[in-house]
Curated annotation (Swiss-Prot):
<feature type="disulfide bond">
    <location>
        <begin position="121"/>
        <end position="188"/>
    </location>
</feature>
<dbReference type="InterPro" id="IPR019846">
    <property type="entry name" value="Nerve_growth_factor_CS"/>
</dbReference>
<dbReference type="InterPro" id="IPR020430">
    <property type="entry name" value="Brain-der_neurotrophic_factor"/>
</dbReference>
<dbReference type="InterPro" id="IPR029034">
    <property type="entry name" value="Cystine-knot_cytokine"/>
</dbReference>
<dbReference type="GO" id="GO:0048812">
    <property type="term" value="P:neuron projection morphogenesis"/>
</dbReference>
<dbReference type="GO" id="GO:0021675">
    <property type="term" value="P:nerve development"/>
</dbReference>
<dbReference type="GO" id="GO:0008083">
    <property type="term" value="F:growth factor activity"/>
</dbReference>
<keyword id="KW-0339">Growth factor</keyword>
<dbReference type="GO" id="GO:0007169">
    <property type="term" value="P:cell surface receptor protein tyrosine kinase signaling pathway"/>
</dbReference>
<dbReference type="GO" id="GO:0005163">
    <property type="term" value="F:nerve growth factor receptor binding"/>
</dbReference>
<dbReference type="Pfam" id="PF00243">
    <property type="entry name" value="NGF"/>
</dbReference>
<dbReference type="InterPro" id="IPR020408">
    <property type="entry name" value="Nerve_growth_factor-like"/>
</dbReference>
<comment type="function">
    <text>Promotes the survival of neuronal populations that are all located either in the central nervous system or directly connected to it.</text>
</comment>
<keyword id="KW-0165">Cleavage on pair of basic residues</keyword>
<dbReference type="GO" id="GO:0030424">
    <property type="term" value="C:axon"/>
</dbReference>
<dbReference type="InterPro" id="IPR002072">
    <property type="entry name" value="Nerve_growth_factor-rel"/>
</dbReference>
<dbReference type="GO" id="GO:0050804">
    <property type="term" value="P:modulation of chemical synaptic transmission"/>
</dbReference>
């Protein structure tokens, strides 16, 4: 089980590195430089797609209408992680590219930061410990206790969950952006996904189960 969880967690996959030959000064003019940067961008996108395809292979295939089945938001660590999960960031980038459905050049110009786009709902994300969660709902609908620490050969590691929730401001006052408030009422609601965690059921049985956490 530990091996399986490490595959699903942060920093366990072997991410290929990107190496380029030469630099911009050795290229023959701006056209070659542009082609070099475009090629590097295409290579980077290809690597991301391979990583996400590999992640999908190890995900369960059964769907659930109440929540996404799998999300890479769990990390085993001795201290609070300083950054969001890498696969979470890659998924966000991949979703953006899929939505754009255009060439790399047009995608770069359609960066939301350049167009001043805003999310439909405001949200906040943070790492949460099992001590803060305490309990969760598993795939069978039962409430289980989330264990704070996971035993490893050289000691124990804490379970951390990267949760995303709607901000109280967007939920309570403003509703969803892009909705005509003259005709429609809207509300930002936090949705959940399943992640694998070490838990204990009401019969004191400890095991790895899929539990729900807030993800958007």
């Amino acid at each position: 089980p530990m091996k399986e969880v490490s595959i699903r967690g942060q920093g366990s996959l072997a991410y290929p590195g990107l190496r380029t030959q030469g630099n911009l000064e050795t290229l023959n003019g701006p056209n070659d430089a542009t082609r070099g940067l475009t090629s590097l961008a295409d290579t980077f996108e290809h690597v991301i797609e391979e990583l996400l395809d590999e992640q999908q292979v190890i995900q369960p295939s059964k769907e659930n209408k109440d929540a996404d089945l799998y999300s890479s938001r769990v990390m085993l660590s001795s201290q609070v992680p300083l950054e969001p999960p890498l696969l979470f960031l890659l998924e966000e980038y991949k979703n953006y590219l899929d939505a754009a459905n255009m060439s790399m050049r047009v995608r770069r110009h359609s960066d939301p930061a350049r167009r001043g786009e805003l999310s439909v709902c405001d949200s906040t994300s943070e790492w949460v410990t099992a001590a803060e969660k305490k309990t969760a709902v598993d795939m069978s609908g039962a409430t289980v206790t989330v264990l704070e620490k996971v035993p490893v050969p050289k000691g124990q590691l804490k379970q951390y969950f990267y949760e995303t929730k709607c901000s109280s401001k967007g939920y309570a006052k403003e509703g969803c952006r892009g909705i005509d408030k003259r005709y429609w009422n809207s509300q930002c609601r936090t949705t959940q996904s399943y992640v694998r965690a070490l838990t204990m059921d009401n019969k004191k049985r400890v095991g790895w189960r899929f539990i729900r956490i807030d993800t958007s």
